[in-house]
Amino acid sequence: FMAGGKPFGSAVVAQAFHEVFLYFESAIYLRFDLPIRRFLLELAPFESFDLEMARMVSGDNNAGALLDWLRRNTTMLRYDDIRRIHFWPQFRSFLLWELDHEYTDEKRRALFNRGGLYYELKEDYPHALECYTLGGDHSKVSELLIRNAELHPGMGHYSEMEKYYRSLPESEILASPSLMQGMS
């Protein structure tokens, strides 16, 4: 029990997170210029990213300068190596909360679809499929599954891709020999 006799539970944890997020919002986030805030929100959906992904997802050719400014003036970014960048988990949770408040579903889907394109160009099909699924682009999911099945016939990738195959309508699978082969 806490002070006041209230039991410690999920409601208390949710309230604590809410208060921390309100603090982050007023003490940190709102002090940034609009381009930095937009940049942070557009990268938040991704566990990690590199400069190329930051450019592609945000559409900002100035992404390198923005990342450099964030690196020099904040401690919110972690670098795995010279290329891979992450937000600190607590700050990423805040940014995702902020993203839910500031961006429409359509704008969030567009971010995931741009992330999907980045991964597709890198031939990282599992991440591309995840992004396109979250972005609601089922035609790209189907296209990538067909491409993957044609690139790796009979290689047993079905278990890795099963949830994406199952998300497709049966009629679409039956209309594509490559999709049927990929499921076998």
Segments from the language model and where they lie:
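Flexible, glycine- and charge-enriched loops at secondary-structure boundaries
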Residues: 14, 18, 60-63, 105, ...
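Amphipathic helix/helix-loop-helix segment enriched in hydrophobic residues with interspersed Lys/Arg
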Residues: 1-19
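Short acidic/histidine-centered micro-motifs embedded in hydrophobic/aromatic stretches
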Residues: 1-4, 42-43, 57, 69, ...
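Extended alpha-helical scaffolding segments used for macromolecular assembly and cargo binding
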Residues: 105-183
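Residue-level marker of structural boundaries
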Residues: 3, 45-48, 63, 72-76, ...
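Short, polar/flexible loop-turn hinges at active-site or ligand-entry regions and domain interfaces
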Residues: 6-11, 60-61, 99-105
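C-terminal boundary/linker of central alpha/beta nucleotide-binding cores
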Residues: 22-100, 110
